[in-house]
A protein has these predicted regions:
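Glyoxalase I/VOC metalloenzyme domain signal
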Residues: 1-5, 9-29, 45-115, 120-282
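A short beta-strand-loop structural module common to alpha/beta enzyme folds
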Residues: 29-36
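N-terminal beta-loop-helix "entrance" segment that forms/cooperates
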Residues: 38-43
Length: 282
């Protein structure tokens, strides 16, 4: 089912969260206010939150955070779990075709909805359009899945946002952590449309047809391997990012005072990333 498109972290303070990502060496897109359905109102309205993104050559990382606390916040239940990763998106060429295929496997996804957002493209305001299929939160305790059709991808993947001080170039993998591995595996197999391949390390890996990976880790094995696990399970627990030069990326982070664990895997701890494990691809 498509390709790994992006992962989204949600934090209580967008400014503080953005500063952490910038310290890691990610260049972030401008602040974009969020709006949508409001309780007790028929028309859409402004939310308490906004987002900024680290746009990579392949995929991106989204940061959602509170900017106006007095307004309605649709992300409260996620923040009540923890600050960290709560969104995992797969990209497809046609949302209607994807929904038809997914509906043959499960009834836990909502029909595609049209979305639009205005943004600056080389000094001209353009309307970015996309269609989202959202998972139903009650069926997916680990977080929210989005199956996404980009209708104007050129407005999101602007070259000026793809040159990062740390040399980040691609989103390679999402790391999922669960105590009930069989149940989590079943949910992922249903979404991806293909079985997992279990490695010699016990990690179950899903490979969406269009690219990227989703890794499923058992909770205790994840904690033993990384020295940390999310405060609530199941959860989206980490990301793997590829850099043009891993050594230079790590040095950039260390020069900014961020420790990089260099062992079999190169890692940055959740305290520096907004609540998830960052793995630097070899």
């Amino acid at each position: 089912m498509g390709s790994l498109d992006h992962l989204g972290a949600i934090v209580r303070d967008l400014g503080a969260g953005a500063a952490r990502w910038e310290k890691l060496g990610f260049l972030l897109s401008p602040v974009s206010r969020q709006r949508g359905k409001m309780p007790g109102r028929d028309e859409d309205g402004p939310w308490a939150t906004a987002n900024r993104c680290a746009i990579l050559q392949r995929g991106y990382l989204e940061l959602i955070g509170v900017v106006e606390p007095a307004l309605y916040n649709p992300w409260t239940k996620f923040l009540d779990r923890f600050e960290g990763l709560h969104l995992l998106a797969l990209r497809v060429p046609d949302a209607d075709a994807a929904f038809a295929e997914l509906s043959r496997r499960t009834g836990t996804l909502n029909a595609p909805v049209q979305r639009a957002r205005n943004l600056d493209v080389d000094g001209v305001e353009k309307t970015m359009r996309f269609r989202n299929i959202f998972s139903r939160d009650e069926a997916y305790p680990e977080g929210r899945y989005i199956v996404l059709e980009h209708q104007t991808p050129e407005y999101l993947w602007q070259p000026r946002y793809q040159t990062h001080p740390n040399g980040a170039i691609a989103l390679e993998a999402a790391l999922v952590c669960a105590e009930d591995v069989p149940a989590q595996r079943k949910r992922l197999e249903t979404l991806v449309g293909a079985p997992a391949l279990e490695g010699t390390d016990g990690v179950q890996r899903f490979a969406p047809a269009g690219g990227g990976r989703i890794e499923l880790h058992g909770a205790e094995a994840f904690a033993a391997r990384y020295g940390w696990k999310p405060p609530a399970l199941p959860a989206f627990a980490g990301v793997e990012v590829r850099f043009a030069d891993r050594e230079r990326a790590a040095a950039h982070m260390e020069d900014n005072g961020i420790p990089v664990q260099r062992g079999e895997e190169w890692l940055v701890a959740p305290a520096h990333t907004n609540g998830f494990m960052l793995r630097l691809a070899p």
